[in-house]
Amino acid sequence: MSANALQPAEPWCPEAETSAWGFHNKWTWVRQPSRGRKNQQWTCHWRVLGPNNGPALVLLHGFGASSGHWRRIAPKLAAQGWQVFSLDLLGFGASDQPGLRQGGPLDNQIWGQQTAAFLEEIVQRPAVLVGNSLGVLSALTTAVLTPHLVRALVAAPLPDPALVQPMPRRHSPWRRSWQRRGLRFVVQLLPLQWIVPLIARSKLIRLGLQGAYTRSITNDLELQELIRRPARRPTAARALRAMTLGMSLRPRGATAPALLEQLATTRLPMLMLWGQNDRFIPLAVGRQVVNQHPWVELKVLNDCGHCPHDEDPNQFLNALMPWLDRNLGNSRPAGDVQQR
């Protein structure tokens, strides 16, 4: 990875906590064939900030967001000596937005494969994974696929309906096949090509975002544009259709309970940072996870909603950094350094 190949977004300065943070680049992910599927090539947007010799930390965004959503903590982590990477997951941000015909259903299995390939090809060393919401499911999947490349995992928070509503009992193959066809038919009927552009240009984006925050976001125009911009792309509707189908038809092994069971024996350090006032994924879900998996640690962040990294970055980092100290010891950076 050559620093000369990386381009900073404009306007940009190392200290600025804006959605344009970091040096930006494009990466072509070649997804390997499986079960009759041919090679697929997708262009993915990613960014980096911090010293080249610093330990690696990868930030994975939530649903509807992108790498820019880490605007308030990425510069602070880089100042502490981390080399901070962030990736726009397939279908989000400035990465490609394939539909069902181009790439099939999109789910955390694919995003986990994408992140694993990113670690192997771009980061090129084991890293700490920090995810927000959907990014956590991707991080969990990556840790199962490539445990040798994940040093620790931070979930802020951990979403999955399967955590509160058990998966239905497994039906016969013919019944599952008809269920899949029926769901695909319904999803194809949804006029998302009309709905998504309308929502992207309406106040609904701000109203939906406000549900994820305790503080008012009315005047945070940068945050609103961060969500609106990818939704205005002509390929956004087809990608949303692929995600809706993919996340609805995930196999049991791709759900959070199954992934946690697989990680339970690996001794992977895992921390959950949960907003006290999270209206999307209530704190009770986090407490339930800890009761079932005592090896997972939970820290509650006061007066925060679903996006604590953006709502209260100082409280977020004050909870994160001591935990990294305890679990990574001498292999994490010490103190402030000059950013790249």
Model-identified regions with their sequence ranges:
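An N-terminal hydrophobic leader/cap segment in hydrolases
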Residues: 1-36
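Conserved alpha/beta-hydrolase catalytic His-Asp/Glu region
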Residues: 44, 193-264
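Short beta-strand/loop motif that positions the catalytic acidic residue
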Residues: 266, 272-274
